[in-house]
Structures are given as C-alpha cells and as structure tokens.
Amino acid sequence: MEMKEEIEAVKQQFHSELDQVNSSQALADLKVRYLGKKGIFRSFSEKLKQCTDKAKLGSLINDFKTYVEDLLQEKSLVLLASEQAEAFSKEKIDSSLPGDSQPSGGRHILKSILDDVVDIFVHLGFCVREAPNIESEANNFTLLNFTEDHPARQMHDTFYLNATTVLRTHTSNVQARELKKQQPPIKVVAPGLCFRNEDISARSHVLFHQVEAFYVDHNVTFSDLTAILSAFYHSFFQRKTELRFRHSYFPFVEPGIEVDVSCECCGKGCALCKHTGWLEVAGAGMIHPQVLRNGNVDPEIYSGYAVGMGIERLAMLKYGVSDIRLFSENDLRFLQQFS
C-alpha cells in the first residue's frame, strides 16, 4: 500500500475510533495512540525516510496531523461540557428539603457594653468621634497638660514605639484633636482601645477599653458633670446606683474627681474592690484651662468637663465578674454566658 493510501485509511480509522469515544479518559488514550511518542504519526515519520517524494508526503502528513489535533480539541470541549452537565445534574439541590441551621456567633461582652455606653451618651446629646491607637506624644500627653517629667510619660507606664510616638494610654487623645479641630460647643463621646504597661491582675490589664465623654461650651459647671454622671449610671445599670465622688488629681482637669460605684459582686467587700465595698469606674473633672488654651479655646469664655470610664470595669460590675482577665482569655464557657 502506498503512503498516500495508508494515510487515507488511517484517517477513516481515526474517524471511526473518535466517534466511539465517550469519556475524557478514552479521548486521552486515543490521543496517545495517534500523537504519542510511539504513536501512528511516529511510524509515519519513520516510513517517510524511505520515500522518494518526501516533501509532498511530509506536507500531507503534517496537514493530517493538524486535522487530528483539531478534531481531538473539539471532542475534548464537547466531552467536558457533557461531563460538567452530568456532574451538575447529580448535585442538584432539592429546595423543598429543610435547611441545616448553622449556629451563629455572638458579640463579645465588651463590645456589647461598649455599644451600650456609647448609645447612652448619644441619647444624652453627644456625637461619636474616634482617633488612632498609635498616637503622638503631643496629643497623648503634652496638649493634655502632662508635664515633661510626669510619671505617666515613663516607659514603665507607657508603651513607646519611638521617641515621639506611643500606644495611647487613654482616649483623651480625641479631646486634644477635637479642640484643635473645631470651636465650641463641642460635645463628644470617644470609645476605643487603650494600652498601659501595667502588671496583669484581677483588676488591671495592659489592654483595655475606655470611653471618654467631654463637653465644652459657655457656662458649663461642675453640677453639669455630676448630673451627667448620675444620668449615665442610672441608665446603664437600670437601677438606682450609689455613687461616690472623691477628689483626685489628673493633669487635664481641675478640679478632678474619681467616681466610685458600690461593688455589686459582694456589696460589702471582696478582692475586686479591695474589701472596701466600692469600685473605681471613672475619672472626671472640669477641663483644665491650659488644655483649652492648647486647643485654641479661650478659657475666659468657655468651660467644660470630661469623664473617662473603663468598659471592663463596667462589665465586671454589671455582671458580677471578679477577674478582668476573663474577658481576654477566649474561654467560650465564660463568653457564652453573655451571648
């Protein structure tokens, strides 16, 4: 049989075999049989060496090979579509079947308390503002009337990222920013994370949440401060809560007070309240005139108050939790009580 006739016979054989292919694996086998290293086209190449009209027959073989490759590619696409359709048909979803319920997570108790605190202040007329956790030493200390030698500026109390940048120790940095940004009246509540280089114990942690609220306007008095504190704690605890105000020193307020609430864990004294029956929950006072001046606000015309409170302390009081460390240990047995 001449080479040309042999090629024609192989072409008919290929068509016959291709028609019988019904899977991707069968197609792969057919491809190897014709185009593989030991396939039919390889044998054509060997026979071509013995022919006299190599150019014409070589061109004929190449055209046939291209033809075979094109048909194999077309068949591959057809089989792929068919196999995908079959797979999809087997994976059909019966929408009449009942769905599997997925257990939903819950908000962390501290997030819930934080939102509750902010909502109360918003209802009292405050607007929400935020500031970065990484803050300049100026906004965190200098503009808030901390002297250069104040202990809070030391590395054993504050986390320094470099000589002039710190992890903020309070959300009062919002106050420093807002006073520079706008003129009174200013009535802001500022929630966020704070960081202090402290020993971790039942009462303190290196990472905690704080909310600062401050109000600057004409004729803001100390009575306005005590009134807002009473209104807040009554709304937060949903009951009459006993408050105690103690004179204290904070660089950014004058006069300054610490706010204590009666300890609900024991009512008379435990490790949480150091056996006093009272738990400190906030620091507050009238904004220091120098802080107002640093924010380009005239203290002869305007006055204001500020209060900062720890969210963890509020959660401990509200739910009778005696150890602040429980909030950050990710123990689901503890956290799911509040979901």
Swiss-Prot record:
Please give the superkingdom of this protein's source: Bacteria
Q: Quick check: keyword Ligase in the entry?
A: yes
A GO molecular function assigned to this protein is:
ATP binding
Q: Which residues form a coiled coil?
A: none
Q: Which GO BP terms sit in this record?
A: phenylalanyl-tRNA aminoacylation
The residues listed in the UniProt record as binding Mg(2+), with positions renumbered to this chain, are: 254
Cellular compartments annotated: Cytoplasm
Q: Which Pfam families match?
A: Phe_tRNA-synt_N (PF02912), tRNA-synt_2d (PF01409)
Q: How does it assemble?
A: Tetramer of two alpha and two beta subunits.
The record's PANTHER family line, in alphabetical order, gives: PHENYLALANINE--TRNA LIGASE, MITOCHONDRIAL, PHENYLALANYL-TRNA SYNTHETASE
From the Swiss-Prot or TrEMBL record, give the protein name. Phenylalanine--tRNA ligase alpha subunit
